[in-house]
């Protein structure tokens, strides 16, 4: 890394430590030319896969769209914001763990349903009714029966 003071190419790392729950590395560096010290932070560049919609259109993963869908299902339910954010982080981790550059929306939807099932059964049924396009009350009953198994 170039020195921010004299633009020299050679710097050495004096100290490294994990910060932000281990998601960042803080490094103290010293320039070998001017001896000035400075701090850098290193984070992994985590790229989420693109999403393939049902009409084969590809678009970047949209975390805000995911959050809106989950919050709509969880409206007026006793689930904390922290629990929702944890679920969103878990879904993103699962998507990254696929190692794929593109994933179908069906996979994202199924991950959301799994997360909602753990968070709140009513929210799960709300989301499933829209996601799976329930046509009548019988389909609601069948899904509720599956939840009780």
Swiss-Prot record:
Zinc fingers (unnamed), renumbered ranges: 3-34
This protein's UniProt keywords: ATP-binding, DNA-binding, Metal-binding, Nucleotide-binding, Repressor, Transcription, Transcription regulation, Zinc, Zinc-finger
GO molecular function, one term: DNA binding
ATP-cone domain location: 49-139
UniProt-listed GO biological process terms: negative regulation of DNA-templated transcription
Family, as annotated: Belongs to the NrdR family.
Function in brief: Negatively regulates transcription of bacterial ribonucleotide reductase nrd genes and operons by binding to NrdR-boxes.
Full protein name: Transcriptional repressor NrdR
UniProt source species: Yersinia enterocolitica serotype O:8 / biotype 1B (strain NCTC 13174 / 8081)
Gene: nrdR
């Amino acid at each position: 890394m170039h020195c921010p003071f004299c633009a020299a190419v050679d710097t050495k790392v004096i100290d490294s430590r994990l910060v932000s729950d281990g998601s960042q590395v803080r490094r103290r560096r010293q320039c070998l030319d001017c001896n000035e010290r400075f701090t850098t932070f290193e984070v992994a560049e985590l790229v989420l896969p693109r999403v393939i919609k049902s009409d084969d259109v590809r678009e970047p993963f949209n975390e805000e769209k995911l959050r809106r869908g989950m919050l709509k299902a969880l409206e007026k339910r006793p689930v904390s914001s922290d629990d929702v954010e944890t679920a969103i982080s878990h879904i993103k981790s699962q998507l990254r763990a696929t190692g794929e550059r593109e994933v179908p929306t069906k996979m994202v939807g199924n991950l959301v349903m799994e997360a909602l099932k753990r968070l709140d059964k009513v929210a799960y049924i709300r989301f499933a009714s829209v996601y799976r396009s329930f046509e009548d009350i019988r389909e609601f009953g069948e899904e509720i029966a599956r939840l009780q198994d």
